[in-house]
Amino acid sequence: MIKGYIGIDIGKKGAIVYQHPDGKIEAYAVPMIKDEVDYAFMYDIIQLMNARHYELYDCHPHMIFEKLGVIFGSSKTTAFSMGHQSGAVEMMAIALRIPYTKIPAKQWQKEMFTGVEEITITGKTARDTKAMALVAAKRLFPGQDFTLTERATKPHDGMVDALLMSEYGKRKGL
């Protein structure tokens, strides 16, 4: 069985990344209609990734996304929205018969940040996980463009996290 991996960074600024067995990487921003996630289009993206993988390799890719926990400092609205999105992603995997793993952020970050010096948020003692993720991703995927559009100048945090989650799944043989 030849495996591919779909990593999903849940959130309105999240991303969907498909890591093909040959190393090719497809990445999409979580589709939005104004301020709402376009779940129908998101489903279509995942369905297409799954169908192509199944057609080529006669098996489903494995989907990895974050198991949500308490996010200190976030509002009730944000917590509800994230939980809603997580449930929707899980149902997409179930409906498409894609095997999936929900992984706590600290678990995949511990593995993927190996060898990356700790970076702190300016003026604070907290780790800057977005900066550390970008450093890790650039080391693991040299030459990869982490922007999602031609006009973008900054790396897309959601793409970086989704790619690292897919790599975590690949390394763990999920």
Which residues fall in each region the model found?
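Phosphate- and other anionic-substrate recognition elements at nucleic-acid/protein interfaces
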Residues: 1-174
